[in-house]
Amino acid sequence: MNVTARSDMPSLILPGGESIPRLGLGTWRMGEARSTRAQEVAVLRHAFAAGITLIDTAEMYGEGGAEEVLGEALRGSGVVRERLFIVSKVYPWNASREGTVAACERA
C-alpha cells in the first residue's frame, strides 16, 4: 500500500523541508490485551488506508505492546515504512542520550 497523506490534511513544514501532518493516530491503550489485538491492527490499517501517516506511540504504552501492534499492522500491509512519521516517547529513566537511543532501537 503506497500511503500518502491526504492533500486536504493540514500539515506543518519542518526545518529540513519535510511536510508532517498535523493530525495523526495515537496508540495509547493499544497492546495491553491479546483479546483486542486484531481490532487494534485493523484500526491502524484502516488509518493507513485513509491516508494517516503520523502515528504516535511510546515504550510505556502497553509496556511496548503498542509498538508491537504497530509493527504487526505494518507487516503485510504493503505500507512503505519510510512514508510514515512515527512519534515516540521514552520513560524518564531512559531520557539520557544513550537511554533514548537504546529505547528507539528496542522499538
Feature-to-residue mapping (PLM):
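A short, structured active-site edge motif that brings together acidic residues
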Residues: 82-94
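CE4/NodB-like, metal-dependent polysaccharide N-deacetylase domain
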Residues: 100-107
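N-terminal binding-site loop/beta-alpha segment at the start of enzyme catalytic domains
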Residues: 1-84
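A short, charged, and often flexible helix/loop element on the N-terminal side
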Residues: 32-33, 92-97
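Conserved donor sugar-nucleotide recognition element shared by glycan-biosynthetic enzymes
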Residues: 66, 96, 100
